[in-house]
């Protein structure tokens, strides 16, 4: 699914890779779409909970997401397929993964530690900045094989840019 999307994914290839059979796959997930939804849900939960979220350190969280995107480019590809094939507009993921983060941003805003504005828009901006060098980038997709100095340079730029964007 990560290389061909939901439409291009073939059940025979999926069951061979998972070492299962069609009856088990359909019995558990109901359909190929159900499997795709379960995979997206699992991968989204993993990446968004990979590091601690601190609304007072959105720059640090963004750098953590940059590193997660390097370690797990498959999630970014799955999200791109989801956007292309099933949800061309609006919220991409399940809101339940965002609620606690948005509440934390709202509290930080009320305390004057994060700039005013719609918490969801700020959250989306930080996510987009963290994905600037991900496989979803239209300009450049970074890989773990690149020199660490390149990643350090990007991390520093990302940290500073997010800090400037969210500081009141």
Please provide the spans of the model-predicted regions.
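C-terminal peripheral helix-coil segments that are non-catalytic and often amphipathic
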Residues: 67, 71, 103-111, 129, ...
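Alpha-helical structural segments
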Residues: 3, 13, 17, 27-67, ...
């Amino acid at each position: 699914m990560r290389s061909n999307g939901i439409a291009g994914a073939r059940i025979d290839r999926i069951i061979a890779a998972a070492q299962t059979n069609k009856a088990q796959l359909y019995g558990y997930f109901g359909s190929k779409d159900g499997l795709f939804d379960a995979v997206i849900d699992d991968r989204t939960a993993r990446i968004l909970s990979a590091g601690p979220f601190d609304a007072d350190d959105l720059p640090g969280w963004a750098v953590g997401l940059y590193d997660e995107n390097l370690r797990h480019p498959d999630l970014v590809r799955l999200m791109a397929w989801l956007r292309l094939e099933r949800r061309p507009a609006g919220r991409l993921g399940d809101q339940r993964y965002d609620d606690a983060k948005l509440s934390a941003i709202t509290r930080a805003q009320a305390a004057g530690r994060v700039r005013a504005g719609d918490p969801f828009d700020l959250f989306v901006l930080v996510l987009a900045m963290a994905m600037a060098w991900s496989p979803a980038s239209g300009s450049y997709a970074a890989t773990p094989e690149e020199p660490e100095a390149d990643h350090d340079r990007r991390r520093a730029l990302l940290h500073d840019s997010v800090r400037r964007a969210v500081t009141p």
